[in-house]
Amino acid sequence: MNLQHHFLIAMPALQDPIFRRSVVYICEHNQDGAMGIIINKPLENLQIEGILEKLKITPEPRDSAIRLDKAVMLGGPLAEDRGFILHTPPSRFASSIRISDNTVITTSRDVLETLGTQQQPSDVLVALGYASWDKGQLEQELLDNAWLTAPADLNILFKTPIAERWREAAKLIGIDILTMPGVAGHA
């Protein structure tokens, strides 16, 4: 089972404060573990423009049609001071990894320097921090019914309003997660 380019959708019974009602986009999954970015937990009072200001990056030439007031996500509990930018191709940046044909993750400053300009990738999600699972840990959490999985959908990743991503991700697999009981059993 390889869940790269899939969503993990927190089951209603998952009460961990970071992962409760979360949707995690899995960037890497192999025999050594998994790494992902939470895509629906906005950091309070932090938008892309605030990150650019803190890093003293001024978009030039600025394209006023591109919004920089989008929320920055809490990507996970690890390395919360480190930025991860999920975006659509191209992957011409210094530190980019292609996750799928349509999704790239970049951790280098050069992608930030394109935000707000015509060179910016068409779709962008900025996160601080990431989530990680050791070898076999994610598989065990799946067996314990902590998560649902669904193939990733770019509309949910980049365009669906943040507050609706949990429910919309579950709908990908035909589930209205708001009607699920808090605890699921094994079939």
Swiss-Prot record:
It comes from Salmonella newport (strain SL254). This is UPF0301 protein YqgE. GO terms for cellular component: cytosol. It holds the Pfam family DUF179. The gene is yqgE. Belongs to the UPF0301 (AlgH) family.
